Amino acid sequence: MIIGYVVGSATTQEANVLLEKKVRSGYYVTLEYDDEKVLGLVTLITTGSPLVDDSLNDIELVQRIKQMGNKIPIYMKAKVKLLCKLDGKLSQPDLPPVAGTPVRLATNEELSTIFSEGTIRIGKLIGSDVEVRIRVNALTRHLAILAATGSGKSNTVAVLSSRLSEVFGSVLIFDYHGEYYESEIKNLNNIEPKINPLNLTPDEFATLLEIRENATIQYRILRRAFKSFLEETKEKLKNGNVNYNELNNNFRNLILKKVDEVSKNEKRKDSKDEVINKIEDFLDRYSEIIDFTAGDVVDKIKIGKVNVINLSSLDEDAIDAIVSHYLRKILTSRKENKMKRKIGLKFPVLVVIEEAHVLLSKDSNTLTKHWAGRIAREGRKFGVGLIIVSQRPKGIDENILSQMTNKIILKMVEPSDKKYVLETSDNLSEDIVEGLSALDTGEAVIVGNIVRMPAIVKIDKFEGKLAGSDPNLIEEWKKAKEEIEEHADVLNWGE
């Protein structure tokens, strides 16, 4: 179906089209010229009238023209980004289209050859029934899922994760808000956020206790105490003289004893006291995540499963320590497997980090940022893919975001976020980024190696419940009122 004709001057990258049919941004079109077919993407729609243009300054004249009703001539124009030749190779057009070139909607067959040849389905092209299937192998080059709040990030993560598990993929979600832990995702494997201190580094333990490196004396005391505790305990392990349940019960006393031993020569008693306070405060708040009986975290990750770690009850520092600990263990274990084969994590893992602007902030040096950066640089070689999720892209470390070769970007309105995403992306153009604010909820731009061409997609709706779904306030108020009244009736019964 012809929707319009090329007008004015054009380039091999872009053409202006005078429309005779209504279309919207995100539709794919085909231009046939120079004995070739070229695929284009509508990136902008404008409308106007030659009678009522920008040069008109007389309000009374506008009112008189308005009274003419349907007689006012109106035009619609589209800006079309020329993507590639439909020649099998998807090569760039050699020549621009000439004025008068007909423009039609691309057929499902033309679009399917480009967008439906991947491994797993993620949704459909906007304005068509053409499946969009992404290339799973390309996820080792990492993925960013970015959007404004409420635009469909969680739905996208749920759909992507569940589809990956169906092809025996292993996904690990660090569930910041508890959205997936009690969801209806198939192949769910919930993992308790337990940490065995014997597997921690002194830096990770210090972060858990909120002792920063710039608190030099406190940091030194804790490092020495924890290192001494680890060495002594691991020596006992070799000799079989360790009872793990006793370690759980006595950890507080054992580590405080070590603090006392290593700080005897410290002149500032207040630093020692502060370390003791930090340890006691941490163990009072988070004793449930410290468990000497907990096995290696890597052993809990299952293949063909959506593995979920619920972090919703923890604060940012505890989350940082846990996430960084898991990232370190996963990368190290995959390296061991690649080098020695028979040990380490035996299958690739895709790791999902939510609230990336917090854990991978450009303004703070978190432990998670260090290990996520390592995975962004090295993970591809060892089968560890990173998927970062955020509603504040401008807050993410640019070195990490720029290494997310693939991006799924849902509705985004904030100009500074769009500008930052454009600056940190090699495969995004300004016209596509500008169109992000026009997307509806659940619609996304997909770019990178996971698709052959930029795809404007309606992401599939996750068929199930997510704990993070918006509450129905009216229904919850009504239910609470009924329960209160029912309880009052019981209390008043027999009076």
UniProtKB/Swiss-Prot annotation:
Q: Which Gene3D superfamilies match?
A: P-loop containing nucleotide triphosphate hydrolases (3.40.50.300)
Annotated ATP binding sites: 141, 150-155, 458-459
* This protein's UniProt keywords: ATP-binding, DNA damage, DNA repair, DNA-binding, Helicase, Hydrolase, Isomerase, Nucleotide-binding
The GO annotation for biological process reads: DNA repair
Report the EC number(s), separated by commas if there are several.
5.6.2.3, 5.6.2.4
* Alphabetical list of InterPro entries matching this protein: DSB_Repair_Helicase, HerA-like, HerA_barrel_dom, HerA_C, HerA_central, P-loop_NTPase
- Gene Ontology molecular function: any one: ATP binding
Transferase in keyword set: no
Q: How is its activity regulated?
A: ATPase activity is slightly stimulated by either circular single- or double-stranded (ds)DNA with a weak preference for dsDNA. Helicase activity is stimulated by Mre11.
Instruction: Give the induction annotation.
Output: Part of the nurA-rad50-mre11-herA operon, these genes are cotranscribed.
Identify which top EC class this enzyme belongs to: isomerase
- Domain of life of the native organism: Archaea
Q: What does this protein do?
A: Involved in DNA double-strand break (DSB) repair. Probably acts with NurA to stimulate resection of the 5' strand and produce the long 3' single-strand that is required for RadA loading. Has DNA-dependent ATPase activity and bidirectional DNA helicase activity. Loads on either a 3' or a 5' DNA tail for subsequent DNA unwinding. Can also unwind blunt-ended dsDNA, Holliday junction and splayed-arm DNA.
* Cross-referenced NCBIfam families: HerA_Thermprot
- Name of the protein in question: DNA double-strand break repair helicase HerA
Species source reads: Sulfurisphaera tokodaii (strain DSM 16993 / JCM 10545 / NBRC 100140 / 7) (Sulfolobus tokodaii)
Q: What gene name is listed for this protein?
A: herA
